[in-house]
Amino acid sequence: MPWVPNLAYPGTWMRLLQADVHAGVYAMAGRLPAGLAVGTHRHTGAVHMFTLSGAWGYREHDYVNRAGSYLYEPPGSIHTLYVPDDNTEVTETLTVVYGTTEYLDDGGAIVAVSDAATNLEAYYVSCEAAGVPRPAAILR
């Protein structure tokens, strides 16, 4: 699967490895630059996240995930992902997401959602923008 720029987060790259829109699960590899911040969000299903290089954390916790770490997020988890400003290398992750990710405003209201279907479409749009043919092997 090709790496393509993630149009939702400038400076990031994504590689969608698998998307099962019927089961509501997808596997995504990401390359995240220093200083990245992702909006506060809640997961309706479990998330498994492997850190392959670099470091990242959640604003709500002191722990920083580093290369070689694994993180399990239970359904209902709410957090704000960030990559430290002083990272000296790109952070690369592999994430398996079940269910929906709900992006929240400061009051906790849902302002956007993503899931296997929206990530599949976003990947296709990013492939087209990068002039990369749509891979057919990522669907169940």
Model-derived segments and spans:
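A short, N-terminal "cap"/entry segment at the start of jelly-roll beta-barrel domains
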Residues: 1-24, 114, 121-140
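Conserved short histidine dyad/triad with adjacent acidic residue
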Residues: 11, 15-18, 23-42, 74-78
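Short glycine/proline-enriched turns and hinge-like loops at secondary-structure junctions
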Residues: 25, 42-44, 63-64, 85-86
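Ligand-binding loop in jelly-roll beta-barrel domains
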Residues: 66, 75-106
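Short intrinsically disordered coil segments
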Residues: 108-118
